[in-house]
Swiss-Prot record:
Gene label: Ntng2
Tissue specificity field: Expression is restricted primarily to neurons of the CNS, particularly in the cerebral cortex, habenular nucleus and superior colliculus. Low levels in lung, kidney, heart and spleen.
Free-text comment on this protein's domains from its UniProt entry: The laminin N-terminal domain mediates 1:1 binding to NGL ligand with sub-micromolar affinity. Three NGL-binding loops mediate discrimination for LRRC4/NGL2 among other NGLs by binding specifically to its LRR repeats. This specificity drives the sorting of a mixed population of molecules into discrete cell surface subdomains.
Region entry NGL discriminant loop III, spans: 264-267
Residues spanning the signal sequence: 1-17
The name this protein goes by in its record: Netrin-G2
Organism: Mus musculus (Mouse)
Length: 589
């Protein structure tokens, strides 16, 4: 009976598929043991576990009460938003509630009554944990979709942000980018950030409501239109750099930059029809457990993986104590169909089960100790001792080669899972980690390498404890940043990565002072400022800001040039000539 049960458990992963089994009990020549497989949690509606934040304060309508109109009938403004009345209030929670059939509930912003000041809103969705997208993100807007919007993501619980996708009715005008569609991207560019015009152009507030972040279109590049070739998708997830991470985040943020305009320009006489209204946000995905768990549950108010393979942490991102014989690694989808678990292991165990530790070899037996394989590594772990001068009366140091020893043999060696080897330098009485990984450095791999900074939301033994600074090469002084991830910017550059400019500067392969603007550096004599870089002067004027009349051209002289038919010299020119003639006459005498 036990043999039949073991056979059933062994065959179960073969028929279940989709990486949903983490381990099975098998019988081997050495006896029964666990066999591990790469595994992942089931797909779920992530919006059921999200925390939402709407900024700035006061952007939600109803305090004070406010009336608003629709684009279809802008002069019938009988609708009202009142936060004190439950029937008329539109709080943020209505973006995630379950709606009765035929009755839409929605969050709504204030109207654009303060035009021309921008009407902008940030909607941040936080899970306090890494999650992975498996389907499109779909945002449903009532009363029209925004004409300009940015979707951003964070990998560190909202400390830093990066663009995910740009949306605009004119991508070139709004962001200086050409419009593209996800379905038209190549396999090598499937994880690139793009700007789309598909979801921003006016088509009626009731006809087109949805704005999408297209995950399925990107998957289809590898798995086919019907997503039937998932084996190819899983293979590319492992082989294509950055593809798997592209669908991973801890937070999403929608930056609503300009509301629906009804297909026209802003009409100042009726600003009560311009606002944002969102009735639903659908996010389909799963907990990111690094292929070390098939369950994800809510604990202490947050999603957490139920880790297998002797791993631990919210994302199964580190090895359990006493299972750190080798450095932690994420599981892999390859080889198909069950992948590689890359389980953490105790000393002497192939799969991570606790076994009897190996017998210690005598210190003189060099075959027990792993050998340093490269000269570069040897330099990194040894200390050179200078030769003693003949007339020295101090003391003599007898250099000895440092011993590189497996980590489990050192009680004082803690590398936080970033190395599995230590070196003991006896004449310094120092135990230090060797070959720190995951962009760490230091005696215990406790510091980040230059060009990286500490991830405050990760434990010290997390693989993602160090985040790359990613400083803009042109806008920053160097590639290093401070402990919060902010880079040191050159003059005129701003932003965490120095990839933006002060309002007094413009970007052109670096930040340069504005030549003109619409505030203080005005173009004169009817000139127009073009992208803060130059003034386009009308006929008859020249200069940096069109301040100089062009008196040198008879057919193109400005009104400040005194001229008549035949180009009569100006009075001040005649006076100068007379003075010169008088001076010449005196000298001749």
């Amino acid at each position: 009976m036990l043999r039949l049960l073991a056979l059933f458990l062994h065959c179960l992963p073969l028929v279940s598929g989709d990486y949903d089994i983490c381990k099975s009990w098998v019988t081997t020549d050495e006896g029964p043991t666990w066999e591990f497989y790469a595994c992942q949690p089931k797909v779920m509606r992530l919006k059921d576990y999200v925390k939402v934040k709407v900024e700035p304060s006061g952007i939600t309508c109803g305090d004070p009460p406010e009336r608003f109109c629709s684009h279809e009938n802008p002069y019938l403004c009988s609708n009202e938003c009142d936060a004190s009345n439950p029937d008329l209030a539109h709080p943020p929670r209505l973006m995630f509630d379950r709606e009765d059939e035929g009755l839409a509930t929605y969050w709504q912003s204030v109207t654009w009554s303060r035009y021309p000041s921008p009407l902008e809103a940030n909607i941040t969705l936080s899970w306090n944990k890494s999650v992975e997208l498996t389907d499109d993100v779909v945002v449903t807007f009532e009363y029209g979709r925004p004409t300009v919007m940015v979707l951003e993501k964070s990998l560190d619980n909202g400390r830093t942000w990066q663009p995910y996708q740009f949306y605009a009715e004119d991508c070139m005008e709004a962001f200086g980018m050409s419009a593209r569609r996800a379905r038209d991207m190549s396999p090598s560019s499937a994880h690139r950030v793009l700007c789309t015009e598909e979801y921003s152009r006016w088509a009626g507030s009731k006809k087109e409501k949805h704005v999408r972040f297209e995950v399925r279109d990107r998957f289809a590049i590898f798995a086919g239109p019907d997503l039937r070739n998932m084996d190819n998708l899983y293979t590319r997830m492992e082989s294509a750099k950055g593809l798997k991470e592209f669908f991973t985040f801890t937070d999403l943020r929608m930056r609503l930059l300009r509301p629906a305009l009804g297909g026209t320009y802003v009409q100042r006489e009726n600003l009560y029809k311009y606002f944002y209204a969102i009735s639903n946000i659908e996010v389909i995905g799963r907990c990111k457990c690094n292929l070390h768990a098939n369950l994800c549950t809510v604990r202490e108010g947050s999603l957490q993986c139920e880790c297998e393979h002797n791993t631990t942490g919210p994302d199964c991102g580190r090895c359990k104590k006493n299972f750190r014989t080798r450095a932690w690694r994420a599981g892999s989808y390859l080889p198909l169909p069950h992948g590689s678990p890359n389980a953490c292991a105790a000393a002497g165990s192939a799969f991570g089960s606790q076994t009897k530790p190996p017998t210690m070899a005598p210190l003189g037996d060099s075959s027990f100790w792993p050998q340093v394989s490269s000269s570069a590594e040897a330099v990194a772990i040894s200390v050179a001792v200078p030769s003693q001068a003949k007339d020295s009366t101090l003391f003599e140091l007898k250099p000895r080669s440092p011993q590189v020893i497996p980590i489990e043999e050192f009680q004082d060696c803690e590398c936080y899972g970033h190395s599995n080897r230590c070196s003991y330098i006896d004449f310094l009485n120092v135990v230090t980690c060797v070959s720190c990984k995951h962009n760490t450095r230091g005696q215990h791999c406790q510091h980040c390498r230059l060009g990286y900074y500490r991830n405050g939301s990760a434990e010290l033994d997390d693989e993602n404890v160090c985040i790359e600074c990613n400083c803009n090469q042109i806008g920053s002084v160097h590639d290093r940043c401070n402990e919060t991830g902010f880079c040191e910017c050159r003059e005129g550059a701003v932003g965490p990565k120095c990839d933006d400019c002060l309002p007094t500067h413009y970007w052109r392969q670096g930040c340069y002072p504005n030549v003109c603007d619409d505030d203080q550096l005005l173009c004169q004599n009817g000139g127009t400022c073009q992208q803060n870089q130059r003034c386009a002067c009308p006929p008859g004027y020249t200069g940096i800001r069109c301040e100089q009349p062009r008196c040198d051209l008879a057919d193109d002289a400005g009104p400040d040039c005194d001229r008549a038919p035949g180009i009569v010299p100006r009075p001040d020119t005649l006076l100068g000539c007379l003075l010169l003639l008088g001076l010449a006459a005196r000298l001749a005498c």
